[in-house]
């Protein structure tokens, strides 16, 4: 299935965008209008589509800049959902007090309302919607049940006209998310060969395999790659330091871009700019 027909858009390159600079982070200090404009002017030279992760002040500024500056960028807008369940399988956390989980559920519903509002406010800019990001995979620190995600999908589909998805690692789509796959308008997968100990010589074939496995399981669904990339640095945990640098990232990006363009697969590269608050 061709994404240009599905979304009624032109072919183009896509990138994930989050503009947090030194001293900035979500929920605290956000990029200014001027900073966002500076970023988007750079992005617009090479990419036609950007993915945003949350319905927060930053995303509202991004949409404002695109509208006011008459930019041609189109947006996949996401709602960021927090943990609604504890996850003992998360290596770096994932356990919360019941009171916090209850607060998160309320906040997640607020994110859905904000997603619908922004989608209806900017229908000419926002071409698709996501109700969450990596909230069902077994290692996540913000675990949400499949049933809850399905309820969010239905809620947003009832309130907005844009196609609705959920962004997740490729693996859960092969089993755990089968019911969800029938609810979303299209499937969104993440593929990171370097995180699964693949060398640059194995990376592109691994990404193709990830995509094909999901696409073949759901032949009637459009599959979009909403995150793919290769790191340039490592702190030594999870990724061997000798498997990441600027050169291998360039090799992977060129191969990914060539393959996805030739196959007409909408693919969001992660990411446009480094975010210092995340670490390495």
Positions of the model-derived regions?
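Hydrophobic faces of well-ordered beta-strands that scaffold small-molecule active sites
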Residues: 11-17, 48-52, 73-79, 127-131, ...
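Acidic-and-aromatic substrate-binding clefts and catalytic sites of carbohydrate-active enzymes
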Residues: 51-61, 83-86, 105-108, 137-138, ...
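Aromatic- and acid-rich polysaccharide-binding/catalytic face
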Residues: 77-79, 88, 127, 133, ...
